[in-house]
Amino acid sequence: MYAIIETGGKQIKVEAGQEIYVEKLGVEADEVVTFDKVLFVGGENVKVGAPFVDGATVTAKVVKEGRAKKIVVFKLKAKKNYRRKQGHRQPYTKLVVEAINA
């Protein structure tokens, strides 16, 4: 069984036991998080939400919070001596999906 959930402005396909990375939730490690914005539940009997499936939830356990690898944003205007260098590390939360309740 799998489901498609919405979190952090993104849609993520999840299965029980899967590790996923989502936008930072601001939750302590080892806490349980419940997602109620379930768009789709697949398996033996398929349920499609309009926009969300009624009564469907996905529970996940928080493993850790961290920051992704650094990316470099470099702006340059040719022949004008304009250069700007900026780095960014996106915060994330690592989860392990425990159950899909449909």
From Swiss-Prot:
Domain of life: Bacteria
Keyword field contains Ribonucleoprotein: yes
InterPro entries: bL21-like (IPR028909), bL21-like_sf (IPR036164), Ribosomal_bL21 (IPR001787), Ribosomal_bL21_CS (IPR018258)
Gene Ontology CC terms, in alphabetical order: cytoplasm; ribonucleoprotein complex; ribosome
A Gene Ontology molecular function term of the record: structural constituent of ribosome
Keywords for this protein: Ribonucleoprotein, Ribosomal protein, RNA-binding, rRNA-binding
UniProt record, GO biological process: translation
Keyword check for Ribonucleoprotein: yes
Subunit structure comment from the entry: Part of the 50S ribosomal subunit. Contacts protein L20.
Similarity comment: Belongs to the bacterial ribosomal protein bL21 family.
Primary role: This protein binds to 23S rRNA in the presence of protein L20.
Record protein name field: Large ribosomal subunit protein bL21
Species per Swiss-Prot/TrEMBL record: Lysinibacillus sphaericus (strain C3-41)
Gene: rplU
